[in-house]
Amino acid sequence: MSKPFVAVLMGSDSDLPTMQATLDVLKTFDIQFEAKVTSAHRTPAATHAYVTDAEARGCKVFICAAGLAAHLAGAVAGITTRPVIGVPIDNGPLQGHDALLSTVMMPGGVPVATVAIGSAGAKNAGYLAAQMLAVGDDELAAAVKAERQKAAEAVQAKDAKLQAKLAQ
């Protein structure tokens, strides 16, 4: 079996600009990943085959992005017992609200961990996958913790700058 990896599945190639945030986070932590366009509706057999094969090859987390009806994450969760993270894409007439509801409303026993709509959610999907993998990887856990510390220091620096400006 190869090194553990994350599978990033998108319902359309138009989802890539949003999902680039996920890929960037995974790269930050040197997490191996595969990215693929597949559809719960248009290519269900291919989606099933990929998920089954990816799991056999060492995929530990699936991140699924889709807009509108957004059944990809739910379809994947029905195939695997690996964690599935759903990213609702902010497109269509409802700007992702339909995708959010389609992704989050799963039957009991078939969970999808759903993040926010759009790019913020895509970024958090990468961090959530890293945290899931870090449960069994102390080095990755330390890297995630260091990244959080770096973000905290950036906030503190901004506050210090604000306080200095207000003191003038």
Put a short name on every predicted segment.
Residues 22-28, 52, 79-81, 130-131:
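Short, solvent-exposed amphipathic alpha-helical segments in soluble enzyme
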Residues 5-10, 34-36, 62-64, 85, ...:
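Short glycine-rich or small-residue beta-strand-to-loop segments that form or flank ligand, phosphate
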Residues 2-42:
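Glycine-rich phosphate/diphosphate-binding loop of Rossmann-like nucleotide-binding domains
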Residues 50-92:
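Glycine-rich phosphate-binding loop
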Residues 15-19, 44-47, 66-75, 94-97, ...:
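Short glycine/serine/threonine-rich phosphate/pyrophosphate-binding segments
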Residues 13, 38-40, 67-68, 89-92, ...:
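Short, ordered loop/turn segments at secondary-structure junctions
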Residues 35-56:
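N-terminal beta-loop-helix "entrance" segment that forms/cooperates
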Residues 4, 9-17, 21, 97-168:
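C-terminal binding/interaction regions
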